[in-house]
Amino acid sequence: METLATRLDVCQERLLDLYEKDSNKLEDQIEHWKCIRLECALQYKAREMGYKVLQHQALPALAVSKGKGHKAIELQLALETLQKTVYSTEPWTLQDTCLERWNAPPTGCLKRRGQTVDVIFDGHQDNTMQYVMWGDIYYQNCDGEGWTKVCSNIDAMGIYYMDAEHKVYYVDFKKEASKYGEYGQWEVRMGSSIIFSPASVSSTEEALSISSTGTAEHTRPANSTPRTDNSTKAIPCTPPPRKRARVYSTDQQPHSTSDPVGCDNDRHISDDNNKNQGRHTSSGDTTPIVHFKGEPNTLKCFRQRIQKYKHLFEQASSTWHWACVPGTTKNRGIVTLTYSSVEQRQQFLVTVRIPPSISMSLGVMSL
């Protein structure tokens, strides 16, 4: 016990010295990961022996120490092979060789000089994600010994680096658009240049490619006009219209007259509830409502997201479901919103984007 405590104390003192030194030499970064590796091994052994506290220090769980130790070994070996190359004389800081940087895309590579790239999905400024284009990427060769230094580049398809003659994309805009968007459209902004989604550029438009060094080929500044010939014109990326004209009646399905690509194919509106709009109750004290139906977690997130639109509805219920109804499952919930008028409800539906996984039914409710 005393031997473990003493060795752990010496190891952590050495780590503090390295942090205070804040060196930019590769050998110091290798020493740092050796100390992390030893610290994890000592903590693992102490926990394995049944100790939960060592030197007034709570010991992490066995799985935590083991996982962190494996990562320390991985980084130590990578830096030791880098030390045998010409890149060992370059300045290397703790930040350059930290685990978070190592795990950032592209994973398993050393990276420096990052530049932020903004990607806007579906033309909505509030649906923007940020990615990093690296000025320097160091990746290991196939033999596991040598290293190659490249810079990352960006085009309409994603962010990549060159491995010999092949593009290795570590950010695929199409996959990201399917994850964060609904219409498969995206716009990339970096500095003064804009790169549009391939689906919105004509076949005569030349491919855009920008390197992290600041050089660009066929780039289009944000305030410039696309090049055209006499017969073909480049089509700019136009976001889907925010306003959809919906027509509700007792004998006609709701439809969109301004969305040619069928963006609402997955959204169902019940006609049975729409018929209630024309029904008069004896009390006359009724309010327009919308039932939003979907998976409970999705509905919870949706209810939180619409808080910024409080001026467009009166009240929102918690998630509920029908009881004693055949076919009803607790995996499908309902959130009900009330409105002061039909006009307010229509304004809400025009303004707020409803996720395609949520269906809705319109109606009225007596208060």
Swiss-Prot record:
Pfam families given in the database record: PPV_E2_C, PPV_E2_N
Report keywords, A-Z.
Activator, DNA replication, DNA-binding, Early protein, Host nucleus, Isopeptide bond, Phosphoprotein, Repressor, Transcription, Transcription regulation, Ubl conjugation
For this record, the Gene Ontology CC terms, alphabetical, are:
host cell nucleus
Which ranges of the sequence are coiled-coil? Answer: none
Is Chloroplast one of the keywords UniProt gives this record?
no
The record places the cross-link (Glycyl lysine isopeptide (Lys-Gly) (interchain with G-Cter in SUMO)) at K293
Q: Which residue intervals make up region (Transactivation domain)?
A: 1-202
Per UniProt, subcellular location reads as: Host nucleus
Q: Where is the composition biased (Basic and acidic residues)?
A: 264-274
Please cite one Gene Ontology biological process associated with this protein: viral DNA genome replication
Keyword Methyltransferase attached = no
Skewed-composition ranges (Polar residues): 207-233, 249-259, 275-286
| Chain spans, region DNA-binding domain | 286-367
What PTM annotation applies here?
Answer: Phosphorylated. Sumoylation plays a regulatory role in E2 transcriptional activity.
Any one GO MF annotation of this record: nucleotide binding
Region of interest (Disordered), residue spans: 207-291
Return the similarity comment.
Belongs to the papillomaviridae E2 protein family.
Could you tell me what this protein does? Plays a role in the initiation of viral DNA replication. A dimer of E2 interacts with a dimer of E1 in order to improve specificity of E1 DNA binding activity. Once the complex recognizes and binds DNA at specific sites, the E2 dimer is removed from DNA. E2 also regulates viral transcription through binding to the E2RE response element (5'-ACCNNNNNNGGT-3') present in multiple copies in the regulatory regions of the viral genome. Activates or represses transcription depending on E2RE's position with regards to proximal promoter elements including the TATA-box.
Assembly and interaction partners: Binds DNA as homodimer. Interacts with protein E1; this interaction greatly increases E1 DNA-binding activity. Interacts with protein L1; this interaction enhances E2-dependent replication and transcription activation. Interacts with protein L2; this interaction inhibits E2 transcriptional activity but not DNA replication function E2. Interacts with protein E7; this interaction inhibits E7 oncogenic activity. Interacts with host TAF1; this interaction modulates E2-dependent transcriptional regulation. Interacts with host BRD4; this interaction mediates E2 transcriptional activation function.
Protein name from the UniProt record: Regulatory protein E2
